[in-house]
Amino acid sequence: MTITEADFEDSASLGAPPGIAESTWVVMKFGGSSVSTAESWNTIAKLLRRRLDDGLRPVIVHSALQGVSNALASVLESALIGDPSDVLEEIRSQHYALALALNLDGPTMLDETLRELDQLVAGVRLVREVSVRVRVRIMALGELMATRLGAAYLAAQSLPVQWLDARDLLTSRTVGGRQTVANYLSATCDFEPDAELQARLSIGDRIVLTQGFIARNKNGETVLLGRGGSDTSAAYFAGKLSARRLEIWSDVPGMFSADPRVVPSARLLVALHYDEAQELASAGSAVLHPRCISPVRAAAIPLFIRCTASPEIAGTVISSVTEEVEPQVKGICIRNGLTLISMDGVGMWQEVGFLAKAFAAFSENGVSVDLVSTSETNVTVSIDTSDGMLSDDIEESLIDDLEKLCRVRVISKCSAVSLVGRKIRTIIPRLASALEVFEEERIHLMSLAANDLNLSFVVDQQQGLRLVSKLHSTIIRKKGASSVFGSSWERLFASDVASAREPDVWWMKKREQLLKLADGQLNAYVYDRDSVATAAKKLLKLKNISRI
């Protein structure tokens, strides 16, 4: 199905000012799953032709191929302790395979970049150490290789495309006055309208294709915008270009009331205010990076989330205009990988400046605080460690500084389960029965957001997913269709859900044989020869195992 301009709500009706609503720029971001197959690229080419036919100027921002960023991180870890050649070969093969599917010459296009990767990894293996600058250079290669393939394919389809290096277009700013690890791995950029950039990208009326995730600092060094930072890159470009809209194309058609891979009954959220989307993203919804909201909200640029595999699904619209509804919970989210820092001390009660001193320690160590809970004798904060920013050295330095002020206790492997919606405070009494699921669990921290959009509970990580499923079933699952809730994931993708519920295991396929074998026997141990052989062959392919 071809998606036309009529399939998108008019930006003016979504609160965009005239300069935005009348803009011809459209920024389209495609995630890793959306750029990893020939079928997806065929869809992208059709979408771009439609945009050009509608008189728009598309800017494409896309990620590394699916799984490549994780593979590059794995290469770094392997290089510190052993031989990463297996993973390097997987990265090479994945790019070559896509090039072949797109009828492109992969080796000619990518071998120079792959040699650079090999050389950087060889250096890491030699010194058994990886600096933040080397880490950044290696992680950036995924986007650079993927966009080379994408631009070449679109050009082969007779589309007027221009490949540009995002590092020549986005300059990061130094936070805190000095270059910290965060300034390299989770950098930020300005996003105010940029007339010079608009003029530069207008030359030739070509489709601009560039990378997400990467930028350059004022010293000319490559920096990253944090894991999942391609969303943020796209939002920066939308802000700088004063784009008519930002389109996020992913493997899901929008934001849902819970992670649909965990809760198949999760409902599509049809329309959200920027504030609600920001809260959902910050609370753990993986569809959007939390930092991508601010640039579009500042300029009142509408944001549309669509699914590359099912572009006909309207998805989620995020803007400053939403239909007012009664107070309600719109999403149940979870964030794993949290660490709690609990600070105790009788002396902190009514002590002037204690919180200032404590938070100064976090600031000086470059550690961002998430949730906060306080009492007369305790302050507990959560830190999101999932992005790898809290190294052992930084954590040790932070604890040393805090122990000069109070007693400190560290609680690792926690999850934050959050209820996100409108006017949460007013509906807490109505949630009493739903919140009974917490009676059996130890709650380390509870926090009600000052903006009244979020109620969060921090629990042990192994309990998180179970609690999300129970809360969603109690609070959201039975809600009818409305201006907020669309269809459930299982209704939108019924065949996918059915296949997911049928595990691909040998004993399901050989059920009848097993039943016959069990007939007349009290018990028996059964091994499947084919499954054992397949597993053995996988082991034999591992180069780091000396003997099997």
Where are these regions (language model features)?
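A charged N-terminal "starter" segment
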Residues: 483-548
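Generic N-terminal amphipathic, Lys/Arg-enriched alpha-helix
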Residues: 22-33, 343, 509-524
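Conserved dinucleotide-binding and phosphotransfer motif residues
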Residues: 54, 157, 299, 365, ...
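Glycine-rich beta-alpha junction loops
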Residues: 65-66, 168, 252-254, 303, ...
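A conserved regulatory-domain signal marking ACT and ACT-like small-molecule sensing domains
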Residues: 312-497
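Nucleotide/pyrophosphate-binding catalytic subdomain
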Residues: 1-288, 293, 459-460, 485-494
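Structural motif
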Residues: 24-26, 57-60, 96, 160-162, ...
